């Protein structure tokens, strides 16, 4: 699920949810996405 959310624009039905998910990834991995 992580990989799917990171790379696939086709699977992003809600962009807001994807943005929130990326923010959580930044906090979790301490990365600059």
UniProtKB/Swiss-Prot annotation:
It comes from Homo sapiens (Human). InterPro entries: MKRN1_C. This is Putative makorin-5. The lineage of its organism: Eukaryota, Metazoa, Chordata, Craniata, Vertebrata.
């Amino acid at each position: 699920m992580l990989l799917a959310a990171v790379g696939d624009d086709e699977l992003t039905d809600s962009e807001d949810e994807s943005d929130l998910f990326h923010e959580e990834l930044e906090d979790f991995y301490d990365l600059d996405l």
